[in-house]
Amino acid sequence: AFVLVLSFFLFVPDGRVPKPEKTGKTIDLRVETNKADLTALINRYLREEKIKGKVLLNDEVVYYGTVGVFSEKMQYKMTFKPKALKNGDLVLKQKSVSLGSVHLPVSYILKFVKTTYHLPKWVIIQPGEKLVYVQLQNMKLENGAKVKVNEFDLQHDDISFTLGFPK
């Protein structure tokens, strides 16, 4: 016991216990997931927010929805290529859009979605650029946490986020 106490005082200057280093304004946790689990989480969020449609993550992001055409409901499909940005946000570059079996101009459908659906403020649709900008850092979580995407490689099922909790 004497050796333990002596070594403590030898390695701690002035006999004071070092304080933990402050690493920033948040406590960061890295979360790794897979396509199947993230697909389930996204679809749960869509249901809770009453956003009609479903997402499927395979080698790309696929969104399925329905739209009224005359008196009929038709299913549409949008495919996106995701890209994680260094600031923690996510860009979804639109690859294709189809309504039933008809392929439509991407910018037209994105403009339709932007004006028709009530999307969260942190989802920015840019029809002219053919992309959806997902500002994850502006997403409001109940506990004040912030989300940043680290990796979003669907082909290799390598998906990770950092959750930053306020101190």
Residue ranges of each PLM-predicted region?
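Extracellular/lumenal and peripheral-membrane lipid-interaction modules
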Residues: 1-167
